[in-house]
Protein backbone atom coordinates (compact mmCIF):
# COMPACT_ATOMS: atom_id res chain seq x y z
CA UNK A 1 0.00 0.00 0.00
CA UNK A 2 2.82 2.42 0.86
CA UNK A 3 4.75 1.55 -2.30
CA UNK A 4 1.64 1.90 -4.44
CA UNK A 5 0.89 5.33 -2.95
CA UNK A 6 4.38 6.59 -3.83
CA UNK A 7 4.16 5.23 -7.38
CA UNK A 8 0.65 6.60 -7.92
CA UNK A 9 1.90 10.03 -6.89
CA UNK A 10 4.61 9.86 -9.54
CA UNK A 11 7.51 8.87 -7.32
CA UNK A 12 9.99 6.04 -7.63
CA UNK A 13 11.07 3.59 -4.92
CA UNK A 14 14.29 1.99 -3.77
CA UNK A 15 13.43 -0.98 -1.57
CA UNK A 16 15.88 -2.17 1.08
CA UNK A 17 15.52 -4.93 3.62
CA UNK A 18 17.20 -8.03 5.04
CA UNK A 19 16.68 -11.78 5.03
CA UNK A 20 18.08 -14.23 7.57
CA UNK A 21 21.29 -13.75 9.54
CA UNK A 22 24.08 -14.35 7.01
CA UNK A 23 27.69 -13.92 8.15
CA UNK A 24 28.70 -13.37 4.53
CA UNK A 25 27.09 -13.40 1.11
CA UNK A 26 24.87 -16.47 0.85
CA UNK A 27 23.09 -17.19 -2.45
CA UNK A 28 20.29 -18.97 -0.56
CA UNK A 29 19.48 -15.68 1.19
CA UNK A 30 19.83 -13.52 -1.91
CA UNK A 31 16.85 -11.37 -2.86
CA UNK A 32 17.24 -12.79 -6.36
CA UNK A 33 15.40 -15.86 -5.08
CA UNK A 34 12.33 -13.82 -4.08
CA UNK A 35 12.48 -11.22 -6.86
CA UNK A 36 9.82 -12.98 -9.01
CA UNK A 37 7.39 -13.09 -6.07
CA UNK A 38 7.86 -9.38 -5.32
CA UNK A 39 7.35 -8.52 -8.98
CA UNK A 40 4.18 -10.61 -9.00
CA UNK A 41 2.80 -8.81 -5.94
CA UNK A 42 3.65 -5.34 -7.27
CA UNK A 43 2.70 -6.26 -10.83
CA UNK A 44 5.78 -4.61 -12.30
CA UNK A 45 9.37 -5.35 -13.26
CA UNK A 46 11.94 -4.41 -10.61
CA UNK A 47 15.46 -3.11 -11.13
CA UNK A 48 17.70 -5.40 -9.09
CA UNK A 49 20.77 -3.76 -7.54
CA UNK A 50 23.46 -6.34 -6.75
CA UNK A 51 25.81 -4.00 -4.86
CA UNK A 52 24.66 -0.41 -4.39
CA UNK A 53 28.23 0.73 -3.61
CA UNK A 54 29.52 -0.08 -7.11
CA UNK A 55 29.51 2.66 -9.74
CA UNK A 56 27.59 0.53 -12.24
CA UNK A 57 24.80 0.02 -9.72
CA UNK A 58 24.80 3.70 -8.75
CA UNK A 59 24.32 4.57 -12.41
CA UNK A 60 21.27 2.29 -12.56
CA UNK A 61 19.81 4.05 -9.52
CA UNK A 62 20.46 7.50 -10.98
CA UNK A 63 18.52 6.51 -14.11
CA UNK A 64 15.41 5.33 -12.25
CA UNK A 65 12.32 6.96 -13.71
CA UNK A 66 9.00 7.96 -12.21
CA UNK A 67 6.91 4.94 -11.11
CA UNK A 68 9.89 2.55 -11.26
CA UNK A 69 11.07 0.38 -8.36
CA UNK A 70 14.59 -0.80 -7.54
CA UNK A 71 15.41 -3.55 -5.05
CA UNK A 72 18.73 -3.57 -3.22
CA UNK A 73 20.36 -6.92 -2.46
CA UNK A 74 20.02 -8.30 1.08
CA UNK A 75 21.60 -5.58 3.25
CA UNK A 76 22.89 -8.13 5.75
CA UNK A 77 25.42 -9.23 3.15
CA UNK A 78 27.23 -6.10 4.38
CA UNK A 79 28.57 -6.34 7.94
CA UNK A 80 28.10 -2.57 8.34
CA UNK A 81 24.30 -2.98 8.29
CA UNK A 82 23.92 -4.71 11.66
CA UNK A 83 26.86 -2.76 13.07
CA UNK A 84 24.89 0.45 12.53
CA UNK A 85 27.79 1.96 10.60
CA UNK A 86 27.18 5.68 9.96
CA UNK A 87 29.22 5.76 6.76
CA UNK A 88 27.21 2.85 5.38
CA UNK A 89 23.94 4.53 6.39
CA UNK A 90 25.03 7.80 4.78
CA UNK A 91 25.80 5.95 1.53
CA UNK A 92 22.31 4.43 1.58
CA UNK A 93 20.79 7.84 2.32
CA UNK A 94 22.58 9.38 -0.66
CA UNK A 95 20.52 7.19 -2.99
CA UNK A 96 17.20 8.89 -2.25
CA UNK A 97 15.42 12.18 -1.53
CA UNK A 98 13.15 10.80 1.22
CA UNK A 99 13.21 7.93 3.71
CA UNK A 100 10.10 5.89 4.47
CA UNK A 101 10.13 3.26 7.23
CA UNK A 102 7.35 0.70 6.92
CA UNK A 103 8.95 -2.04 9.05
CA UNK A 104 7.52 -1.78 12.56
CA UNK A 105 8.96 -5.16 13.55
CA UNK A 106 12.57 -4.04 13.01
CA UNK A 107 12.34 -0.37 13.96
CA UNK A 108 13.79 -1.06 17.41
CA UNK A 109 17.07 -2.29 15.96
CA UNK A 110 19.99 0.17 15.83
CA UNK A 111 20.91 -0.90 12.31
CA UNK A 112 22.16 1.27 9.47
CA UNK A 113 18.98 0.98 7.38
CA UNK A 114 16.59 1.77 10.24
CA UNK A 115 17.74 3.92 13.16
CA UNK A 116 20.94 5.37 11.70
CA UNK A 117 19.80 6.29 8.19
CA UNK A 118 16.93 8.37 9.59
CA UNK A 119 19.47 10.88 10.94
CA UNK A 120 20.40 11.82 7.39
CA UNK A 121 16.83 12.84 6.53
CA UNK A 122 16.08 15.54 9.15
CA UNK A 123 13.12 16.93 7.20
CA UNK A 124 12.25 14.10 4.81
CA UNK A 125 11.63 10.95 6.86
CA UNK A 126 8.21 9.36 7.02
CA UNK A 127 6.38 6.32 8.35
CA UNK A 128 4.60 4.00 5.94
CA UNK A 129 0.98 2.88 6.23
CA UNK A 130 1.82 -0.44 7.91
CA UNK A 131 4.03 1.17 10.56
CA UNK A 132 1.31 3.77 11.20
CA UNK A 133 -1.30 1.05 11.74
CA UNK A 134 0.89 -0.72 14.30
CA UNK A 135 1.72 2.47 16.21
CA UNK A 136 -1.90 3.65 16.18
CA UNK A 137 -3.13 0.29 17.49
CA UNK A 138 -0.71 0.37 20.42
CA UNK A 139 -1.37 4.05 21.12
CA UNK A 140 -5.11 3.42 21.18
CA UNK A 141 -4.71 0.83 23.95
CA UNK A 142 -2.34 2.98 25.98
CA UNK A 143 -4.51 6.10 25.68
CA UNK A 144 -7.78 4.36 26.49
CA UNK A 145 -7.02 4.30 30.21
CA UNK A 146 -8.77 0.94 30.51
CA UNK A 147 -7.29 -1.56 32.93
CA UNK A 148 -5.83 -4.11 33.13
CA UNK A 149 -3.41 -3.92 30.20
CA UNK A 150 -1.78 -7.17 29.09
CA UNK A 151 1.25 -7.01 26.79
CA UNK A 152 2.45 -10.06 24.84
CA UNK A 153 6.03 -9.82 23.58
CA UNK A 154 7.77 -12.35 21.34
CA UNK A 155 11.10 -12.62 19.60
CA UNK A 156 14.34 -14.54 19.64
CA UNK A 157 16.63 -12.26 21.63
CA UNK A 158 16.28 -10.43 24.94
CA UNK A 159 19.19 -8.21 23.89
CA UNK A 160 17.19 -6.68 21.04
CA UNK A 161 14.00 -6.24 23.09
CA UNK A 162 15.17 -5.26 26.58
CA UNK A 163 14.62 -1.51 26.08
CA UNK A 164 11.10 -2.14 24.78
CA UNK A 165 10.33 -4.56 27.62
CA UNK A 166 11.46 -2.05 30.26
CA UNK A 167 9.31 0.63 28.65
CA UNK A 168 6.25 -1.62 28.49
CA UNK A 169 6.68 -2.65 32.13
CA UNK A 170 5.95 0.97 33.06
CA UNK A 171 2.62 0.88 31.20
CA UNK A 172 1.28 -2.67 31.33
CA UNK A 173 -0.20 -4.50 34.32
CA UNK A 174 1.02 -7.88 33.10
CA UNK A 175 3.51 -9.01 30.47
CA UNK A 176 3.67 -12.40 28.75
CA UNK A 177 7.05 -13.27 27.22
CA UNK A 178 7.00 -15.73 24.33
CA UNK A 179 9.27 -16.88 21.54
CA UNK A 180 12.90 -17.87 21.88
CA UNK A 181 13.73 -15.14 24.38
CA UNK A 182 11.40 -16.76 26.92
CA UNK A 183 14.14 -19.31 27.63
CA UNK A 184 16.40 -16.59 29.08
CA UNK A 185 13.66 -15.58 31.52
CA UNK A 186 12.85 -19.19 32.44
CA UNK A 187 16.55 -19.88 33.06
CA UNK A 188 16.88 -16.70 35.15
CA UNK A 189 14.00 -17.83 37.36
CA UNK A 190 15.55 -21.25 37.93
CA UNK A 191 13.51 -23.18 35.38
CA UNK A 192 14.71 -26.01 33.17
CA UNK A 193 15.20 -25.25 29.47
CA UNK A 194 17.11 -28.34 28.30
CA UNK A 195 19.33 -27.52 25.32
CA UNK A 196 17.41 -24.39 24.38
CA UNK A 197 19.47 -21.31 23.60
CA UNK A 198 19.51 -18.45 26.11
CA UNK A 199 21.48 -15.21 26.58
CA UNK A 200 23.74 -15.69 29.59
CA UNK A 201 24.71 -12.02 29.78
CA UNK A 202 21.05 -11.03 30.34
CA UNK A 203 20.18 -13.51 33.11
CA UNK A 204 20.52 -10.94 35.91
CA UNK A 205 18.42 -8.37 34.09
CA UNK A 206 15.79 -10.98 33.22
CA UNK A 207 15.21 -11.63 36.94
Residue ranges of each PLM-predicted region?
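Active-site loop-to-helix "anion-binding N-cap" substructures in soluble metabolic enzymes
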Residues: 1-207
Amino acid sequence: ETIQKILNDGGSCILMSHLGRPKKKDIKLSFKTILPQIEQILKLKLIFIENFKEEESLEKIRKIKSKEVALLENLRFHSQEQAGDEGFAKKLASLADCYVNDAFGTSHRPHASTTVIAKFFPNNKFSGYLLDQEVNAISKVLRSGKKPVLAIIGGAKVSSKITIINSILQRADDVIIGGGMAFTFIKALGGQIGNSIFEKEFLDEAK
